[in-house]
From Swiss-Prot:
Membership in a protein family: Belongs to the influenza viruses polymerase PB1 family.
Record region (Disordered): 50-82
One of the GO BP terms on file: symbiont-mediated suppression of host gene expression
Keyword terms, alphabetized: Eukaryotic host gene expression shutoff by virus, Eukaryotic host transcription shutoff by virus, Host cytoplasm, Host gene expression shutoff by virus, Host nucleus, Host-virus interaction, Inhibition of host RNA polymerase II by virus, Nucleotide-binding, Nucleotidyltransferase, Phosphoprotein, RNA-directed RNA polymerase, Transferase, Viral RNA replication, Viral transcription
Positions occupied by motif Nuclear localization signal: 187-195, 203-216
Annotated function: RNA-dependent RNA polymerase which is responsible for replication and transcription of virus RNA segments. The transcription of viral mRNAs occurs by a unique mechanism called cap-snatching. 5' methylated caps of cellular mRNAs are cleaved after 10-13 nucleotides by PA. In turn, these short capped RNAs are used as primers by PB1 for transcription of viral mRNAs. During virus replication, PB1 initiates RNA synthesis and copy vRNA into complementary RNA (cRNA) which in turn serves as a template for the production of more vRNAs.
Gene behind the chain: PB1
Stored Pfam families: Flu_PB1
Full protein name: RNA-directed RNA polymerase catalytic subunit
Cellular component, GO annotation: host cell cytoplasm; host cell nucleus
Record-annotated RdRp catalytic domain positions: 286-483
Post-translational modification note: Phosphorylated by host PRKCA.
Reactions it catalyzes: RNA(n) + a ribonucleoside 5'-triphosphate = RNA(n+1) + diphosphate
Amino acid sequence: MDVNPTLLFLKVPAQNAISTTFPYTGDPPYSHGTGTGYTMDTVNRTHQYSEKGKWTTNTETGAPQLNPIDGPLPEDNEPSGYAQTDCVLEAMAFLEKSHPGIFENSCLETMEIVQQTRVDKLTQGRQTYDWTLNRNQPAATALANTIEVFRSNGLTANESGRLIDFLKDVMESMDKGEMEITTHFQRKRRVRDNMTKKMVTQRTIGKKKQRLNKRSYLIRALTLNTMTKDAERGKLKRRAIATPGMQIRGFVYFVETLARSICEKLEQSGLPVGGNEKKAKLANVVRKMMTNSQDTELSFTITGDNTKWNENQNPRMFLAMITYITRKQPEWFRNVLSIAPIMFSNKMARLGKGYMFESKSMKLRTQIPAEMLASIDLKYFNESTRKKIEKIRPLLIDGTASLSPGMMMGMFNMLSTVLGVSILNLGQKRYTKTTYWWDGLQSSDDFALIVNAPNHEGIQAGVDRFYRTCKLVGINMSKKKSYINRTGTFEFTS
């Protein structure tokens, strides 16, 4: 029998009818299986956005690395990661000019925090890549394992010390010729159960000592494990998120502390505040734009979305920002803060568990671990997977993919917000030196942009200039997903 779809809704209140197409009701989708495919997508896409960069080889790990910095200037509207160092530094300088003393004050605050933070700060957080076991563990366990291994290798780490001392150990560990770790392994054997007389699989867990040479250790220290982001609504495709190991975490924490301190002083930053305070900030920006605009002026707001924000950001750019922000600070402080972006420039993405294969005819299932993707015959894969593997092969080392460009999800939210705000800051009339000007709010990859101008041409010119300025620092405003309204009606980080 044919069902007329409109009949289905006749007896249904409008509210309920809407909810059938609305992604926020019911159970959120969870992902099952391995995230290997999604991670390969991320790695391949990130390289594609930076493909015109320069290839080099990391002398320590042998990993091929792509550096898009100061790459070709954009000629089209395709998303790209070719940030120009001088443009980023210029934007930082203007940000400081608009907020005298902001960087120095934030550095002083951060310096104090750096000297007081204890190691146990790193036990906060969920799943963390545990480099000693090469898999995810709760943060506290991963930290304990790292400290235990450090100690047995002659470093001075302890669980109650300062974080900065632990980070000194991390630095020393990277200079060591080899690191000895204790790994766990499973033995399976088939035995007959005495009671039921059936065959059962018995598992025993053993421990064995393993030596990692410098190269293997560095690869693990620079590895971000990947998982599939769960419970994302309104999306057809899942995506991969990263969980860094303990060597990287402490350094990232200090960088984000500094960036958070800067964001707190910026009226255009939607972080670190949330909820009502964020709405209040937005209201203030709108009020400022309305108050300062002449009656004859037009005001439009863009609810913006950036294309693949973190895949087009670049750690080398963050290094340049940090170098500039901390330029008047003591050497030790500058060094501690520059390590996170340097590690990210040399990061490796772990491809997860690999692929499941099953043979219908023989009722067999087997897992192909990520380590085998470099050598396995591609005839076993379908076409799309085959293309992915072919693309990623030159980047593979020990089941991890070299991923120099891009940031991975959720890593430097605060610092990337500072970069976004620095472009919003350039919209002041004294900088644009024309009839249009802009302001807005930035919260990680989300932004609201308000443009004022005497006429529609001016608005268009202002939006264009904002778009192009963003391009120069590796931010790609999505022309498909951003929409423009009269100021007063728009959405920001729903």
